[in-house]
Amino acid sequence: MALSSVALAVSAIAVMSAPAAYAETARAFDIAPQPAASAVQDFARQSGLQILASGDDLEGLRTNAVKGTFTPHAALKNLISGTGLTIKSNDGRVVVLTRAQAQDAASQADTAQAVAPAEEPQEVVVVGMRRSMRDAIAQKRSHSGVAEYVSAKEIGVLPDVTIAETLARLPGVTATRDRGNDSQAAIRGIGPRMVLGTINGREVATSEPDRNVRWEIYPSEVVSGAAVYKSSEARLLSGGISGTVDLQTIRPLQYSGPEFVARAGLVHYDGGSEFPDYDRTGWRASGSWVKKVNDQLAFVIGLTGQNQKNGYESFRGWGYNDDKIRSGDSTGPIVAGGPDVPTPWGAGAQAKFLDADRLGASVGLQYRPNERFELTYDLLYSKYKIDEKQNQAWYGGNNWGNWDGANVGAHTEPVIIGGDLVGATTAWSEITAVVSRYQEDKSLLVTGLNGKWMLDNWTVSADLSYSTAERENIWRSVQMNYYPESMTWRLGEDPHISVSQQPDTATFAPEAGEASPGRVKDELTSGQLDLRRDFSGDFWTSLQFGARYADRTKSEAIGYGTNPAPLAGVTVDGSTLKAYEFKNFDIPAMLDGNFDSLLRTVYGANAVTVNPGSLPFNAEVSEKVWEGYVQGNFDTTFINARAVGNVGVRVVDVESLSTGDSTVSQWVEVTPGNWVEQSVVTRVSAGVSYTKVLPSASVSLEVMPGTYLKLGAARVISRPPLNELRVNRSLSSGAPYTGSSGNPYLKPFEADQIDVSYEYYFGAEALFAVAGYYKKVGNYVGYSQRSETINGNNYVLTSPVNSSSSGGISGLEFTFQTPFSALTDVAFLDNFGVYANLALVNSDIKERVPNGNPMPMVGIADQTGIFDLWYSANGFEARLGAKYNSEYTALMGWDSSALVRVRPSTTLDFSASYAVTPAVSVRFQAGNLLDTPSEVYTDYKRHRTGDVEYYGRRFLVDLTVRF
C-alpha cells in the first residue's frame, strides 16, 4: 500500500529535511492522548521530523500522552508504545510508521531492505541566521492564530544588536527611534499605547511614565525567542489591542547549543564627527554559561555590557502662535492693519554628546526531577546610565513670535506659506547659547518562579512574578544671551539661519539657568494559576482555565524644576568657548564649553544641588487587576480539512486609584513691592473601576498540505497609559491662562476584531502569506481642550478624554520569504534568499488635535515594508536589508499631548558574519547606511518644523567564541 504523508514536520518546511543529528537533540514534548492520526501530526510539529504513515495503519488506534523532554525518537517510541505501530526510518530525518504484522523473519528483512536506501545521503545542517528563520517560520505554521515569531535557539545567532531591531523587521511591526536606536514597538499601525509587552508571558514594570516597554534595553544575547500575537486567545493576558509582544529567555534543560558563548567588539558612530573633543567609539560585550548539571537540573547565567557613544545634531521648531488651533493663543498681524498671521515662537539647534552605559545580568534555573514536576526560575536585571553633554542654541525667543500683535512690524522680508510665517529678517533677535548636561540612571528587575505539575490528564501551573523599574533624571543648563543686529531665518523643510555676528565673537549676558529633575518608580507583583485537562475525544483536545491577580503602582516626581540666577556682573566671552559648525544644518556656529566650570562661574559653586533621587513622589497611580479565563482547544476535521483552534472567554476586573498634587501658580506680594510667583498645592485623589468580558475564538484550517487558512475573532482591551490616569493638574499664573491635567476616570480602549490569514508553505524556509484584519475601536483616548473658570479667570485646560464614538482600523499584510533554490535550479543562487513584507493600513480614527484638522491616530502608517536579501553558505552569512515606513503620528517625548507627524523614511542596513572555525566567528554590521534622519512636523502642516535629527551611521565589529 502506498504511504501517504499525514503530517509535515513544522521545522522541515525547507527543501532539506531535519538533519539526522536533529533527531538526537532533546526537545520538550506536550502531546495529549488522542487518536493516532492526529497524534502523529502533533508529534511531527513538535519534533521536527517528517512522518509517513498510511491512513489504514493508523485507523482505530489511540496513542499515549507524551510530556517532558526527550529525543524525538525516544518520544515517538513512548507515543506509540502498545499501539501495534512500529518505527522504520531510512536516515533519521524521515520516519515511517507501519502497523506490526505476523511476518516471518525473511519477509521482515525484505521489507526493511525495501525501505532502507543503499547509501546514506549527505546531511545538510542549517545553522545560524538561517536556522533562526526556519524555526520561526515553523512556529508560525503550527500556531492556530495569527502571529509572528523570532527564534534564537543558539545564543548569539540573531544578526541584531538588540531585540528591538529584530522586532521591527517583522510584518506589520514598526519601531520608534530614540538616540539612534529602535526603541518602542507599534503593531499594525497602532502605537505603543496599545501594545502589551511581556517577558516569559509576564507583564513587566517599565521606567517610562506610561506602560510602554523600551525593547532596546534587552540585548539579543539573552533572548531565545519572541512572539508577536496579532490575534487574541483567552489564555493570553489582556492589554494588547494591536498585539502582544512576548520575549522568551533561555530554558537551560531544553538548550542544545554550546555551553559557553562569549562575544566582544567595538561600535562606532560616524554622527557628530564635527563635535569637539568627542570620541564616537564604544564597545559591546556579553558572556553566557549554560550548564546541565544532570538530566534533571540546569542553569544559565548571562552577563552583558555596552558603552554607546553617538553624537547627533538636531533642529527643532517651537510651535506656532495660532489661536485657530490653540484657543489660548492670540494671533496678531505682522504688519499694521494686515490680516492675522500665525508666527513661530522660535527654534533651537542642539548637539548631543551621548555617553551611555548598559550593564545586564540574566539567570535561569530549570529543575525537572521527574516527568510529573518542573520548576523554573528566571531573572533579568538591567542598569542603564546616560551622561550626555548638550550644546544648544535658541533663536528668536524675543521677537519671532507675535502674540496679540506685540511684535507687529518686526518681520521684514516675510516668507508666507499656507498663511503662516515661515521666514523673515528680524533685528536684535535673541540668541541663547546653552551648555547643558542630561543625566539619567535607570534600572529594571524582572523575576519569576513557575511550578508545573503533570498528573495523568491534568497539568497545573502556578506562577509568581515581580518586576520593578526606576528612573532618575536631571537636565541642567547654563544659559547665555546675545543679540545680533540682524537675523535672517527660514523654517519649513530646509531650515536655515544666518546672523550678522557669529556667536564666538560675542559677549554673552548670562540669564537664569535651569535644573529640571524627574523620578519614576514602577512596581508590579502578580500571581497566576493555570489548569489544563487533556481529553482523548475526536473534537476537544483540552480545556484550559485559570486566574491571575496583579498589583501595580507607578509613582512620579514631577514639577520640581529650579532656576538659579546668575551672579551679579558676570559675562562670558564667546571666544573662550569652542566654536564648531553643524554638518547637516546651515546655522550659526555652535559653542561648546566645560559644563561644570561654566556652572560655577555663572551661578556659583552650589547653585544647582538638586538630587533627583531625593524628590518626593507627587503623582501616583495604583492598579489592581483580577483576570479569569476558560478556553477549550479542539482538533477535528472540517470539510476534509484538519481544523485546529480554540474558543474561550476572559473576564477582567480593574480598580485604579490616582493620587497627586493639583497646582495653581499665583503671584504673591511677600513684602511691599516684592511680588513672587508661588504655587498652591492641594492633594487630591480619584479613581475608576470596571469589568470587561472578552470572548475569543480562532481556527487554523489545513485546506491542502502546506496551505493554511486561519480565522480569528475577539474582543480586546488596552488599559489607558498610566501617566494619562494621573489626577494632577497644573495651572498658569497669568495670561494666557492655560492648564493641563490627567484624567483618572479614563476607560480602557476597546476593540472588536476579526483576523484572516492565508499561509502557503512551499519549501525550505519558504512562505507566502496574506493576512487581513479589521478592528472596531471604541473609547479611544485623545487629548482635548475645554474652558473652565478658575478664580475668575477663563482657563483653557488640556486633558485626555475617551471618545464617545468608535472608529475602524483595517489592513493587509503580505509576507514572502524563500531561498532562491525553491524558485530556480540555477546553482549559483542556491545559497541566496529573500525575506520581504509589506503592511497596508487604513483608519478613520482621528486624534483631537489640531482643532479643525485633526491628525490620524497615533501609530497609523499607511505603508511599511521590509526587503532583505540574504546569503548563507560555508560558514558565511550576509544580509542587506531595506526598511520603509510612510508618514505617521507619534508622541513627542514624555508629553502624551505633544503629537507630531513623522515624515516617511527609508533605512538600509548590512550585516555579515563568518565562522572561522566551529568555535570562533566574526561579525560586521553597518546600520543606517543612508544616514536617514528622523523628521517630524507639527500641527499637521508640513511647513511647521517640528524636529529633525541626524544620528549618523553605526558600524560594529565583534568576535564570538563558543565552546
Q: Predicted segment positions?
A:
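Outer-membrane beta-barrel signature, preferentially recognizing the C-terminal barrel domain
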Residues: 435-444, 613, 617-623, 688, ...
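Short, acidic, small-residue-rich periplasmic hinge/interaction motif at the N-terminus
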Residues: 40-42, 46-47, 99-156, 192
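Short loop/turn motifs that connect adjacent beta-strands in outer-membrane beta-barrel proteins
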Residues: 236, 252-258, 293-296, 372, ...
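Transmembrane beta-barrel wall of Gram-negative outer-membrane proteins
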Residues: 277-400, 415-416, 442-450, 456, ...
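Short acidic/polar hinge/loop motifs at secondary-structure boundaries
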Residues: 202-230, 280
